[in-house]
Amino acid sequence: MEVRMTPLARSRPRWRNQLSLQGGGPAQATLVIAMMLAGCAVGPNFKRPNAPTIAYPTPPSAIGPQSVVYGGDVAGDWYRLFQSQSLNALVQEALRANPDLEGARHNLLAAQYELQAVAGSALPQLEVGAKASRAKINGSFLYQPPDALQRTGNQFSLGPSLAYDLDVFGRIRRSIESQAAQTDQVGHQALNVYVTLINEVVLTAFDFAASAEEIAATRALVADLQAQYDLTQTLENAGKTTRSDTLQAKAQLENTRAGLPNLQKQHDIYRNTLLRLTGKAPDDNSLPPLALHDFALPVQLPLSLPSQLVRQRPDVLEAEDTLHLASAQVGVAQAARFPSFNISAQYAQQSGGTGDLFTKAAQVWSIGLNVAQPVFEGGRLRAREQEARQRYLQAEAQYRGTVIDAFIEVADAMQALQHDTDSYNAHNTALDAARANRDLARVQFERGLVSELVVLTAQQQYQNGVLTQVQSDAQRFADAANLFHALGGGWWNVQADAGGEPAILEPVKRNAALSLPGAPYDQP
């Protein structure tokens, strides 16, 4: 199994040889001018990693009553497949009121505004300034003897100034690309909050319902054990059983009773977790009723194609954004080693008095081109470039690891579904046998064939089976939910009117706020 990546170019910047000053001439000058007009950007152009050549373990065509649709898509409202109105209401309330989701939305909006701010650096910067000063000058300033002319006077100036970085080698554009990748990263983090929130609400709802039924089953079991203990004690007093049997019944009763407080504690934790997920305080009593028998298993289970999975999971997309950001930073570091070209222009009305400030004679202007080339910086710029390359390689390795983790999570979910279904079927068979044994014991007791103790023992075995079956049933629901989450959560299929938040669900458009031709991306 191998995850392949598009490698980062490790050759010298391609423009370095072309800009060599050795043997200069008209051809070289033409090349420099052409580069300035074209606005070339040094550094690697990012390309999305190819879909990995990873396969799932051979999926079954069906898991119990559920069919597996290989290549099937995940519904945006997959939680509705469990057919519970109470669950649907909880998810919608969480999407509306969860503070973490609201915080993620504002964080995304802030990142988008930051991208717009950074993008502004690619455009000419125009300012209007005004200045008023009073100074004393001497003749030496005017190339005259110091005492030839001494004057104290006012100076007034008003006018615009323009500065523009031509960005010949793409330092600014790579910086904007880096910021755009970072904005995408924030957007996919927000998507991760969204899909994780839905999954947590669904799983906690299952746990909340299951814990209530576990409490009920345990209380019924305690009642049966209490009756069994009372009967054993009566038999001991009549000399029909031993003291050891009575103590054993007592220990079993109290051990089972001791589990009730812990079950109630877990039930309260699940309740408080649901309140937190839906943005409510612990004293709120508005949770809808939830019971396991109100849920239904989804009839079909989708299994996305491997090539689709890496385009669906927010964590993989976030890792891709990190890789893109690192790629752009390599370009920023490379561009810092090349010359910078800046145009500056100024126009002003300057005068020693306000009366003639706006006359034609008071007009002044200047325009110029500034060129700066780093010559000696102690190896700092080269080290920064090597650092950026290592950051890229680190991001590349992290991306591969994230992709592998994604496939493992899907495989784990599928295997859990299969194993827990097998376990459920076995528990169900055992429960049917325990129910039949209990019913038979009751009939035999009514006919005087067995003692009451036999009936109570059969009833106890049945209640133990009910308790185990509740846990097994809840686990199957959780396995299905975990599969939907592992496949990406279906956020790409959510409609705006389905209760989702458009600011979270809409993918961040790369350079959406920009109008830069020749964007330095190579993306499908």
Task: Indicate residue ranges for each PLM-predicted region.
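Sec/SRP-type N-terminal targeting helices
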Residues: E102-G103, A119-G120, L166-Y194, S244, ...
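Terminal intrinsically disordered/low-complexity segments used for targeting and assembly
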Residues: E2-V3, P7, G25-R96, Y143, ...
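Membrane-embedded beta-strand positions in outer-membrane beta-barrel channels/transporters
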Residues: V91, S157-S161, A205, P306, ...
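N-terminal secretory signal peptides that target proteins for export/translocation
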Residues: M1-Q22
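Short flexible linkers and secondary-structure junctions
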Residues: A41-E200, S340-A345, V364, V375-E385
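Outer-membrane beta-barrel proteins
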Residues: I137-F141, R243, G352-D356
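Periplasmic alpha-helical coiled-coil/stalk elements that build and connect Gram-negative outer-membrane
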Residues: I172, H188-L305, A416, D420, ...
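Structural signature of outer-membrane beta-barrel domains
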Residues: S133-I137, L277, A348-G352
